[in-house]
Amino acid sequence: VRKLTFVDWVFALVAVVIVVAGSVMMFGRSTPPTQHQNMGPVVPASHSDGLSEAESGYRFERVVMPANRGTGVPVAFRILGADGKPVTRFLDNQTKQMHFFVVRDDMHVFRHVHPVLDGDTWDTSVDLPDGGAYRMFAEFIPLDTKDPLHPVVLGVPFSLAGDTELVPVPQPEAQSRTGTGYSVTRVDEPATLGVMSERKLRFAIRTPDGVPVEGLEPHLGANGHMTGFHTMLLSATHLHPVEPLGAPLINGELTFRAVFADRGEYRLFLEFSHHGRLHTAAFTVAVE
């Protein structure tokens, strides 16, 4: 029997590699994908959160920034597209093309207004009673979006000189009261929320007399509006109302769908209209 030379061993090894590679390619082509391979992510993906002034091809351009505290402080900005030109048309998002928020870093100041377009610039004004560190957010839905439920949110920090009385963020609790005397109680369980898990948050609204509201007046084309802000990161989270506009509220309860992308505490601001007035209730929730 002839002994195998070094060359024979090399040719044998090459042949084995060719056979194995061919088998892998054959099975890779012929084996259908499994059910798990076709499945998407098991948890919702995070969305635009206002931590950047540029995202998804859009950029926030400062035109007029708040310079002093006071009432009716002017703000103006442009939204630039990928080509660097101002974008002046967006889809309606709860009846408005542009939502604009301002929060102070202790969550004691919250403003939600709707800028108007002047040429290529969005103009508005906000009440800023105290100095301190703030963040502003521009929220809009591009005309060509493939995900109309999740707007683009661009955020820009700013600060105001002057006396600042920092207010500790309230601990998570079930009940809140508006400045107009309404009580709002969170009734869903458990109290602590899971990160990147969709949840429905339910809020029972009572009049100053303690009577459950039977229905709410339209506010931004819905029963209410809710936005959350991470108390440390100052990121924004958009929550979606569940009950259709005009439907009676069972026991005065209003429901929102929410997904929170980060662990920590969030401050939620619920806005609703009743008896011709806008009411705002704030809640702190914990996410783990």
Language model region names:
Residues V1-E288:
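Intrinsically disordered, low-complexity terminal tails/loops enriched in metal-binding residues
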